[in-house]
Amino acid sequence: MSKGTASFGKKNKRNTEMCRRCGRQSYHKQKNSCSSCGYPNPKMRNPGSIKARRRRTIGTGRMRYMKRELRAAKNGHKGDPILRTLWAKN
């Protein structure tokens, strides 16, 4: 069997699947580990460089919860119904 173009056509099985912890397509089925977050190790895998850390830090995704919290904090949590009821009691 040759080791060139002909053998590359046979590489059609998938080795990676979605990771349970980080959700990326980097969980290797044969190695049973995620190349992105290090799952199943209890500690998260540390990205090597500062640039890589910047890519995956807080503020790079959708930030559904944080966006709402930052806006509410800026306005003094005036629109929060739970806090409004607490202030009404006092």
UniProtKB/Swiss-Prot annotation:
Coiled-coil stretches noted in the UniProt entry, renumbered to this chain: none
Cofactor note: Binds 1 zinc ion per subunit.
Signal peptide positions (record): none
Region (Disordered): 21-59
GO BP annotations listed: translation
Domain of life: Eukaryota
InterPro entries: Ribosomal_eL37, Ribosomal_eL37/eL43, Ribosomal_zn-bd
This protein's UniProt keywords: Metal-binding, Ribonucleoprotein, Ribosomal protein, RNA-binding, rRNA-binding, Zinc, Zinc-finger
Cofactor(s) needed for function: Zn(2+)
A single GO cellular-component term on record: cytosolic large ribosomal subunit
C4-type zinc finger span: 19-37
Key word Lipid biosynthesis present: no
A GO term for molecular function: zinc ion binding
Chain residues that bind Zn(2+): 19, 22, 34, 37
Record's compositionally biased regions (Basic residues): 21-31
Protein family membership: Belongs to the eukaryotic ribosomal protein eL37 family.
Protein known as: Large ribosomal subunit protein eL37
Gene that encodes the chain: RPL37
